[in-house]
């Protein structure tokens, strides 16, 4: 992948090679699940900020509206640490393709719906080798819900992966 972050810097998969990272999909004007997800990603950023093995990656699903300037303002408002967390924008079809094919974050639908909006509450944990290790409900820090992993479990899994290396 190759996208542009909140600072206008090109971000590629090379920037995440050998890193544990958490990916999600959002847009800055979302009024439903995104504000809570972003707050929870800020919570996660605070927990992992001293771990050099871990990064965060948020993809805008409305890249035409979420320009570099918009992402920069949003990042500043939310307290994003630039070295830890990239908010990226780019070609919408590329973002939706990576969401579906690389992160598997949406249910498969009809081919004509391929580029409909990707809107999911999932945080995706990717290990140092680029393998998906789990999907976690980005709206749930610590509630126990059947068949669902919460963000406390995500943090435990990040710590486990950090110790393995």
What are these regions (language model features)?
Residues 1-12:
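N-terminal signal-anchor transmembrane helix
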Residues 11-41, 56-57:
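Short active-site neighborhood of thiol/selenol oxidoreductases, capturing the structured segment around
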Residues 20, 45-49, 78, 99-102, ...:
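Sec/Tat-exported extracytoplasmic proteins
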Residues 21-24, 57-60, 122-125, 135:
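Soluble periplasmic/extracytoplasmic beta-strand elements of cell-envelope proteins
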Residues 38-98:
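Structural microenvironment flanking redox-active thiols in thiol-disulfide oxidoreductases
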Residues 85, 96, 102-108, 118-124:
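Structural micro-motif
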Residues 111-165:
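Thiol-/selenol-based redox modules, centered on thioredoxin-like
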């Amino acid at each position: 992948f190759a996208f542009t972050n909140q600072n206008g810097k090109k971000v590629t998969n090379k920037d995440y090679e050998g890193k544990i990272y958490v990916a999600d999909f959002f847009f800055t004007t979302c009024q439903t699940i995104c504000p809570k997800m972003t707050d929870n990603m800020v919570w996660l950023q605070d927990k992992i900020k001293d771990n050099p093995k871990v990064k965060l990656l948020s993809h805008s699903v409305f890249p035409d509206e979420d320009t570099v300037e918009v992402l920069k303002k949003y990042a500043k408002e939310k307290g994003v640490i630039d070295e830890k967390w990239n908010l990226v924008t780019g070609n919408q079809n590329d973002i939706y393709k990576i969401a579906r094919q690389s992160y598997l974050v949406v249910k498969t639908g009809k081919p004509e719906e391929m580029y409909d909006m990707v809107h999911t509450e999932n945080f995706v944990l990717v290990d140092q080798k680029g393998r998906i290790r789990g999907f976690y409900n980005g709206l749930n820090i610590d509630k126990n819900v059947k068949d669902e992993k919460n963000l406390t479990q995500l943090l435990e899994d990040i710590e486990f992966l950090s110790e393995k290396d």
